[in-house]
Swiss-Prot record:
Gene3D superfamilies: Immunoglobulins. Homodimer. Interacts with TTN/titin. Interacts with PNKD. GO terms for molecular function: identical protein binding; kinase binding; protein homodimerization activity; structural constituent of muscle. It comes from the Eukaryota. Residues 41-51, 63-80, 179-220, 874-888 have a biased composition (Low complexity). This is Myomesin-1.
Length: 1685
């Protein structure tokens, strides 16, 4: 083998071992040919050696040599597999024809040893072996990572696989049943002596069988002494035919086994497959025009797979030095070098070098670049001085001179507005400066090189590079990179440019679209695409208008009448051969916004014609023209087009494409497009007026949602051809869906004016254009766009934010179909620089199409290594990509990348530094203000002292400086006679604990100490010098003091005290601790213990503190010897709960995940959360997961169980002791697990379970009600374990607002008996409810359903809503009532009692449909059967009420109850006979029982005491009352069920007054009885004729007998002859007038009188004259009157 030239002359970058490396490798390759038999271990050597071994073995057996036996035993000692491997070639040795008996065969297993394959120690000289480390293997070739191909990687792969390969092969071999054993010669001789004349073959067969079973040894060593004779006794035996046949069969079996074994081992021998590279297809030379692309291809075979390196003029091509210039690919053995945009410098000889472990092979090809028509590319030269770009290591100072490139006055993150101008620039300083040689400067936007245009211009003044925007548009937004290349070195710098929308002319109008491009151009139409704007003006965008303008004119015309929403549109109506430009405007309800930037000019040409116009003559020119004349074939009708398909379909248009027919004649053809609705054969021609000239066509005015088929016909002057095959059915509508909203918006701090926002990309999004990010000040509700050009990826840096302000963010995705819904708002984040000032200068920032790391470049020069130019690579790189090589490495030392890696896969951005907006990025060494070294530790104490060492302890610094403390450094010094000595370092490596053991001290020497803390910002100031401590052996038996006391979770009545065990535990281990406390101002004798028994924990929750009191604490350790010295004091600590203090809360999310959450509003930028369990850090706990964001932290339990019981606490660093804890005991564990299960397997809450009810028509309603249901809730209806669906029998309904779920059945039949179940599913939550309808339950329900059905039929006519019933009114009357419905005037309502009509309701104009019959003073005579009948032409209904027997009794009891309740209170009334107690009721019936009691005893009725009812009065009469009648009287009215009582107290004043009244009435009665009175006989008026006699008789009474006198006209009348007055026997008075005259007329009165009283009885006497006498008297009086005149 030979090394390639460039490897032999290569200068290794590591000079410390480069010479040894190369010399060893060269030596190895020089010896490789000589030892090829040893190294390759090919199958040929194997077979030849096996043959020779077999022949030597056979000869040895025949001669039976004892010396050979000894030699063979020696050979077994050297290689355990020799004899068996030698015999494995029994039948195949002679066929190979090898007779070299001296051939040396090495053990194959040693050849597969990994160490010789890896290190090749046997190939090195003794000096080289001494210089080599034992574990270092010399590489065959050392080069830069990933950029040099060769033997290195192949060897490394073989080294790594060697051990595993041997193990695998041995395993496979062992599975074949092969064993390793050593067999002595004697055993062989014994075996041979027992065999027949075929013993030689039998012995060989056995040995061959052993060889077939071995895979660990395939070679043997056969010495020349093997030919010596063996002393062996031969015996002859007669063999039967059966034995011979068996032996022959064994030989045939052995032969087959050996063939299989050799084939198996040939497969295991990988060296048999090795072969050098071989070019199957070599690269071809090319001659191309300038600015065209060229590809060089080659195909290479070889094993291991060769590495391919491409060279240009013998210099390796670095794809990163010229990004986008070269693309190297390797796929399936085909290797390609693509050169883009060839120029004159690309004219060169190109070489493809293929290399593997077997060698190297090259193939050459030349590329010649010609300039077309002598055009001169002026863009290759810069304005100003003459420039000469440096490339491929050629510089004025020779090969690979080093250049230092620096940027000064760099441009920062910039903000512009549409329509404005902007310039980006920086000053470029290159050292050393070379005359006439200028750097190559290139500008990039999002990784795409920029070329000068009317929108952007570049300028290089010799010192400053400038990029100028003449008219900003949103298309100009992106990451801008300036890349300066000088020779093989380069440097670059990037910053982002944001372009805001211009102020709208119409308030609320949308912003302008962007990126208007031509997707496809044809002679009939051009498809235009664009991107939707981020700002819609406050109302949704209704669509877009597309405008076109012919190049050379200023006349814009609108292409569509109605706005289109899809961001693609085919513009038709174009004139073939003319060029157009386009623009797009968005419209919403407020108006039309600004137009977009115009597109690039596009010509309306057939693609083939366009390609013909752009084509150039092929090279070289031959000067020959061959013309073939054919007879024209006229009149050929073209055939049908082929490959007709729908290439694009939206709701607005459908695009068809096809291929021209093969048979079309010599003239041009045109096309007619036809359509028909799916399922019909009604074909309609779409372009009826003008045929289509191009094989593509866009159809408009199709009905959205309908399905169509299409076909195309060709036509020419000969006619219209047959139609093509119709397309498949196409539904008109947008095939592209609007993307889903992104998720998991996570903001993180970056700088003082920027925040990095990351998100989870939209799922299943197709043709995604990018994302828009919006920001809003928390609580304002006003959103502003962070980018106006969609960005790809899932990360973006939002700039231009206000420092210290809190922002929330949201993201939406966009594709051609539209913009997605907004994502959920992120958590609020305060804008401030992260620790370290944002992106670390040593870590490559993650960039994407939303470039998040807008950073300055590092302060050193890069060589031509991976740049940030391909957009996907630049903007999609990750932070963990390898950093770029330093500037000390040159191009010649780089490896050529693996051919399968393209530029797009390899390009990575250089490490850069982040700079806040508004500050120069040119000062990378400026100190960060948000982090600082920690303050000094304090309270240094000696924890334990030994004879020559001491253990120190100290307290953590009060201020940690914004980052966690990473360690401490301890210094000490001796103090001799009070004079301190020189400080010395106690530890070189920082210690992480607040305790450290300092060794190698001097016994009885006094020392002082100081401690300094360190964090990522640096080493802090040292602490104050400690007290003097004497280094001496502590011999005390009790433990030392605990240390590192800390108070946390301080509340108004409690706190947690923590400490660390003492370093010195005494003579026995520490068994516990005692904790003491006292008030800070109290005296030393005020210490009191908190625990009576020692506690084993190193923490204690102190309770019972007084709010506002300051306390100090100390801890003492105890062991078997006693209690040790108290610790240093902890505190003072004030017992108070500070405002805003929050506690750890437990949360169980929807997935059942249990977590502890804590929030702190008083965090500083340097604060962090620290979780612990039982006050031991949980940082490495596999059962817990901690996540912190902003001022919130969450600790999640992966699998909460008994192992997780304990106290969980969270401390906030860099605060004044903010902490909180949460206890999880067994009860809390059970509660949380139950809650977790409920959340993990949620159930839909149910208000009411599944129930059944019968509706009015006999329908059956199954229903249940859930607490709430979302719009996605589903219900499965199950009957007897089978799902039922809506149909004629079942009607289902779900009311998601009320949660009611219903199923209706018209009728219950016998087959409907069974179990009904409703299964609910709402998201993850499920539930079910079941009702069982079997047996009596089902029959009862079925009967009720039938009854309700009949009831519904009944209710179609006049019917009773409420049947006849009774009610007792307040007046104790009985009211019979019923409620009727559906009646009209013609309806008859008749009342019956005992089938006798008692009432007819002729006028039933009642509002409520109530019919009543009132029965007053209801009694037994009213008992009977009452009935009401409703009847009209629609039907009849009746209601019957039985008021007999028990029903009558029940009614009477209710009547009696009402009467009893109507009773008035008992009153007392005196009578002449005695005293009466009484009460009034509404009316009285006999069924109402009345009972009286006196002083709790029932009254025995007699003549003196009796009761009765008079009308409505119920009374108790007590005649001639005595004092014994005093007391409480109760009247009880019993209605048949209940007694109703009325009471009165007849005692005291009530009795006295009643009794006095009784006496008065009694006397009045006596007087009344004996009073004089007229008993009768005198009329009221007496009319008597004059002259008659009047006789009147009158009876009088009185005791004593009364005196009698008469009156006439109120005057006393005396008895005389005319008027005779008599009084006889004291009882009778006579009144007589004889000869009554008119003078006797008048009023008379009889007056009787005795001592008890008097009485007057009046009567009137009227005397009249007869008629004749009266007439005469009248005449006489008349006459007398005339005379008087």
């Amino acid at each position: 083998m030979s090394l390639p030239f460039y490897q032999r002359c290569h200068q290794h970058y590591d000079l410390s071992y480069r010479n040894k490396d190369v010399r060893s490798t060269v030596s190895h390759y020089q010896r490789e040919k000589k030892r090829s038999a040893v190294y390759t271990q090919g199958s040929t050597a194997y077979s030849s050696r096996s043959s020779a071994a077999h022949r030597r073995e056979s000869e040895a057996f025949r001669r039976a040599s004892a010396s050979s036996s000894q030699q063979q035993a020696s050979q077994h000692a050297l290689s355990s597999e020799v004899s068996r491997k030698a015999a494995s070639a029994y039948d195949y040795g002679s066929s190979h024809g090898l007779t070299d008996s001296s051939l040396l065969l090495d053990d194959y297993s040693s050849k597969l040893s990994p160490k010789p394959k890896r290190a090749k120690h046997s190939l090195l000289s003794g000096e080289e072996k001494e210089n080599l480390p034992s574990d270092y293997m010399v590489p065959i070739f050392s080069g830069r990572q990933k950029h040099v191909s060769g033997i290195t990687d192949t060897e490394e792969e073989r080294i790594k696989e060697a051990a595993a390969y041997i193990a695998q092969r041995n395993l496979l071999a062992s599975e074949e049943g092969i064993t390793t054993s050593k067999q002595s010669t004697a055993s062989k001789q014994t075996t041979a002596s027992k065999q027949s004349t075929a013993s030689k073959q039998s012995t060989a067969s056995k040995q061959s069988t052993a060889s077939r079973q071995s895979t660990a040894s395939r070679q043997s060593v056969v010495s020349k002494q093997a030919t010596s004779a063996l002393q062996q006794e031969e015996t002859s035996e007669k063999k039967s035919r059966k034995v011979v046949i068996r032996e022959k069969a064994e030989r045939l079996s052995l032969r087959k086994t050996l063939e299989e074994t050799e084939t198996y081992h040939a497969k295991l021998n990988e060296d048999h497959l090795l072969h050098a590279p071989e070019f199957i297809i070599k690269p071809r030379s090319h001659t191309v025009w300038e600015k065209e692309n060229v590809k060089l291809h080659c195909s290479i075979a070889g094993w291991p797979e060769p590495r391919v390196t491409w060279y240009k003029n013998q210099v390796p091509i670095n794809v990163h030095a010229n990004p986008g210039k070269y693309i190297i690919e390797s796929r399936y053995g085909m290797h390609t070098l693509e050169i883009n945009g060839c120029d004159f410098e690309d004219t060169a000889q190109y070489r493809a070098s293929a290399m593997n472990v077997k060698g190297e092979l090259s193939a050459y090809a030349s590329v010649v670049v010609k300039r077309y028509k002598g055009e001169f590319d002026e863009t290759r030269f810069h304005a100003g001085a003459s420039t000469m770009p440096l490339s491929f290591g050629v510089t004025p100072y020779g090969y690979a001179s080093r250049f230092e490139i620096h940027f000064d006055d760099k441009f920062d993150v910039s903000f512009g507005r549409e329509g404005e101008t902007m310039s980006l620039g920086c000053r470029v300083v290159i050292t050393p400066e070379i005359k006439h040689f200028q750097p190559e400067i290139q500008w990039y936007r999002n990784g795409v090189p920029l070329s000068p245009s009317k929108w952007v211009q570049t300028l290089w003044s010799g010192e400053r590079a400038t990029l100028t925007f003449s008219h900003l548009n949103k298309e100009d937004e992106g990451l801008y990179t300036i890349r300066v290349r000088m020779g093989e070195y380069y440097e670059q710098y990037s910053a982002y440019v944001f372009v805001r929308d211009a102020d709208a002319e119409i308030e609320g109008a949308p912003a302008a679209p962007l990126d208007v491009k031509c997707l496809e151009a044809n002679k009939d139409y051009i498809i235009i695409s664009w991107k939707q704007p981020a700002v819609d003006g406050g109302s949704p965008i209704l669509g877009y208008f597309i405008d076109k303008c012919e190049v050379g004119t200023d006349s814009w015309s609108q292409c569509n009448d109605t706005p289109v929403k899809f961001a693609r549109f085919p513009v038709t109506g174009l004139i073939e051969g003319r060029s157009y430009i386009f623009r797009v405007r968005a419209v919403n309800k407020m108006g039309i916004g600004f137009p977009s930037r115009v597109s690039e000019p596009v010509a309306a040409l057939d693609p083939a014609e366009k390609a013909r116009l752009k084509s150039r003559p092929s090279a070289p020119w031959t000067g020959q023209i061959i013309v073939t004349e054919e007879e024209p074939s006229e009149g050929i009708v073209p055939g049908p087009p082929t490959d007709l398909s729908v290439t694009e379909a939206t709701r607005s248009y459908v695009v068809l494409s096809w291929k021209p027919p093969g048979q079309r004649g010599h003239e041009g053809i045109m096309y007619f497009v036809e359509k028909c609705e799916a399922g019909t054969e009604n074909w309609q021609r779409v372009n009826t007026e003008l045929p289509v000239k191009s094989p593509r066509f866009a159809l408009f005015d199709l009905a959205e949602g309908k399905s169509y088929c299409f076909r195309v016909r060709c036509s020419n002057s000969a006619g219209v051809g047959e139609p093509s095959e119709a397309t498949e059915v196409t539904v008109v509508g947008d095939k592209l869906d609007i993307p889903k909203a992104p998720g998991k918006i996570i903001p993180s701090r970056n700088t003082d004016t920027s925040v990095v926002v990351s998100w989870e990309e939209s799922k299943d999004a197709k043709e995604l254009v990018g994302y828009y990010i919006e920001a809003s000040v928390a609580g304002s509700g006003k959103w502003e766009p962070c980018n106006n050009n969609p960005v790809k990826g899932s990360r973006f840096t939002c700039h231009g934010l206000v420092t210290g302000q809190s922002y929330i963010f949201r993201v939406r995705a966009v594709n051609a179909a539209g913009l997605s819904e907004y994502s959920q708002d992120s958590e609020a984040i305060e804008v401030k620089a992260a620790i370290g000032g944002g992106v670390s200068p040593d870590v490559c920032p993650a960039l994407s199409d939303e470039p998040g790391g807008l950073t300055a470049s590092r302060g050193r020069v890069h060589e031509a290594s991976p740049p940030t130019f391909q957009k996907d690579a630049l903007l999609g790189s990750k932070p963990n990509k390898p950093s770029l090589p330093s500037s000390s490495q040159n191009l010649g030392q780089t490896e050529v990348s693996k051919v399968s890696e393209t530029v797009q896969e390899e390009l990575t951005p250089p490490p850069q530094k982040a700079a806040p907006q508004g500050k120069s990025k040119s000062d990378p060494l400026k100190k960060k203000t948000d982090r600082a070294p920690p303050s000094p530790p304090c309270d240094i104490t000696c924890l334990e002292s030994f004879r020559d060492s001491m253990v120190l302890g100290w307290k953590q610094p009060d201020k940690i400086g914004g980052a966690e403390i990473t360690g401490y450094y301890v210094n000490y010094r001796e103090v001799i006679d009070g004079v301190p000595g020189k400080w010395r370092e106690a530890n070189v490596k920082a210690v992480s604990e607040e305790a450290y053991k300092i060794s190698n001290l001097k016994e009885n020497m006094v020392y002082q100490f100081q401690v300094a803390a360190m964090n990522m910002a640096g080493l802090g100031a040292p602490s104050a010098v400690s007290e003097c401590f004497k280094c001496e052996e502590w011999t005390i038996a009790v433990p030392g003091p605990p240390h590192s006391l800390k108070c946390s979770e301080v509340r108004k009545d409690s706190l947690v005290l923590q400490w660390k065990p003492p370093v010195h535990s005494g003579r026995t281990p520490v068994t516990g601790y005692f904790v003491d406390l006292k008030e800070a101002k109290a005296k030393e004798d005020q210490w009191r213990g908190l625990n009576e028994a020692a506690i084993k924990n190193v923490y204690l929750k102190v309770r019972g503190l007084k709010e506002g009191v300051s306390y100090v604490f100390r801890v003492r350790a105890i062991n078997q010897a006693g209690v040790g010295k108290p610790s240093d004091l902890a505190g003072p600590v004030v017992a108070e709960t500070r405002p805003g203090t929050k506690e750890v809360v437990v949360n169980v999310d929807d997935d059942g995940v249990i977590s502890l959450n804590f929030e702190c509003d008083k965090m500083t930028p340097k604060s962090e959360f620290s979780w612990s369990k039982d006050y031991v850090s949980t940082e490495d706990s596999p059962r817990l997961e901690v996540e912190s964001k902003g001022n919130k932290t969450k600790m999640t339990f992966k699998d909460l169980g008994m192992d997780d019981l304990g106290i969980y606490s969270c401390d906030v660093t860099d605060t004044d002791g903010i902490a909180s804890s949460y206890l999880i005991d067994e009860e809390e564990l059970k509660r949380l697990l139950a809650l977790s299960h409920e959340h993990k397997f949620p159930t839909v809450p149910v208000k009411s379970e599944l129930a059944v009810e019968i509706l009015e028509k006999g329908q059956v309603r199954f229903w249940m009600q859930a607490e709430k249901l979302s719009g996605n809730a589903k219900v499965n209806y199950i009957f007897n374990e089978k799902e039922i669906f809506e149909g004629p029998k079942y009607k289902m309904h779900i009311d998601r607002n009320t949660g009611i779920i219903e199923m209706f059945m018209e009728k219950l039949q016998d087959e409907d008996e069974g179990t009904y179940t409703f299964q609910l599913q709402d998201g993850k939550a499920t539930n079910h409810s079941t009702v069982v309808l079997v047996g009596d339950v089902f029959k009862k329900l079925q009967k009720e359903a039938e009854f309700q059905r009949q009831e519904w039929i009944r209710k179609q006519g006049p019917h009773f809503v409420e049947y006849l019933s009774w009610e007792v009114t307040g007046e104790c009357n009985v009211l019979l009532k019923c409620k009727v419905a559906n009646i009209k005037k013609e309806t008859h309502i008749v009342w019956y009692k005992d089938e006798r009509e008692i009432s007819v309701d002729e006028k039933h104009d009642f509002k409520d449909g109530i019919c009543t019959l009132l029965i007053t003073e209801f009694s037994k005579k009213d008992a009977g059967i009452y009935e009401v009948i409703l009847k009209d032409d629609r039907g009849k209904d009746k209601s019957r009420l039985k008021l007999v027997d028990e029903a009558f009794k029940e009614l009477m009891m209710e009547v009696c109850k009402k009467i009893a309740l109507s009773a008035t209170d008992l009153k007392i009334q005196s009578t002449a006979e005695g005293i009466q107690l009484y009460s009034f009721v509404t009316y009285y019936v006999e069924d109402l029982k009345v009972n009286w009691s006196h002083n709790g005893s029932a009254i025995r009725y007699s003549d003196r005491v009796k009761t009765g009812v008079t009308g409505e009065q119920i009374w108790l009469q007590i005649n001639e009352p005595t004092p014994n009648d005093k007391g409480k009287y109760v009247m009880e009215l019993f209605d048949g069920k209940t007694g109703h009582q009325k009471t009165v107290d007849l005692s005291g004043q009530a009795y006295d007054e009643a009794y006095a009244e009784f006496q008065r009435l009694k006397q009045a009665a006596i007087a009344e009885k004996n009073r004089a009175r007229v008993l009768g006989g005198l009329p009221d008026v007496v009319t008597i004729q004059e002259g008659k006699a009047l006789n009147l008789t009158c009876n009088v009474w009185g005791d004593p007998p009364p005196e009698v006198s008469w009156l006439k006209n109120e005057k006393a009348l005396a008895s005389d002859d005319h008027c005779n007055l008599k009084f006889e026997a004291g009882r009778t008075a006579y009144f007589t007038i004889n000869g009554v005259s008119t003078a006797d007329s008048g009023k008379y009165g009889l007056v009787v009188k005795n001592k008890y009283g008097s009485e007057t009885s009046d009567f009137t006497v009227s005397v009249f004259i007869p008629e004749e006498e009266a007439r005469m008297a009248a005449l006489e009086s008349l006459k007398g009157g005339k005379k008087a005149k």
